[in-house]
Amino acid sequence: RDFCLSRGLGDVYKRQKVKAGKIEDYVSPLFYAPNVSWLAQRNGMHPRNSLMISLNASEGNHMHANGISMELYGKGYVLGPDAGIGLFLYSGLDYAEYYSQFPSHNTVCVDGISSYPVMKSNHSFDLLSCFPASAEPGKGFTSVTYSQVAFREPESRADQTRLMSIVTTGPETGYYVDVFRSRKERGGDKMHDYF
């Protein structure tokens, strides 16, 4: 596991000892990948005591109509899982009517109509602000991380923002903050259901 093969003169492979890297040198407290509309924030790397938030929207292939989807991880468990793709995978009625739609993604559905075409959809969120800055690997973890993202829900034309934060209160304790705002552009709001 600490060895790799390298080519030398005459395409002869030889084993070289390679020092294993430390995960902490490559992981940052907050990481944002706009090309796939995904954001991850964490307060550490401890398998039992650290907390993590994952946010994603739809940007590219194999995506669902999920708005600002959120998953929570902590204490070694998936605490707020995304529902996945269903029993019959992509060909099932359960996928078409539930697993690919807003209610299965820990997000807000507006007036019961929030949706958009799935597969190869381009409905990403925009990162409005965050702390610490995205992709600064090797820096120490802070006691607070936050991100604020914005999304336009196309069916109801609702402007949505979601602020997520992790607050570390001790070496083994902390909590999440989730503030979701949703408002239709032209008013006439009936309901904004949080699933």
What do the predicted segments below correspond to?
Residues 2-13:
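Single conserved hydrophobic/aromatic residue that forms the stacking wall/gate
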Residues 11-195:
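Catalytic and substrate-binding regions of extracellular carbohydrate-active enzymes
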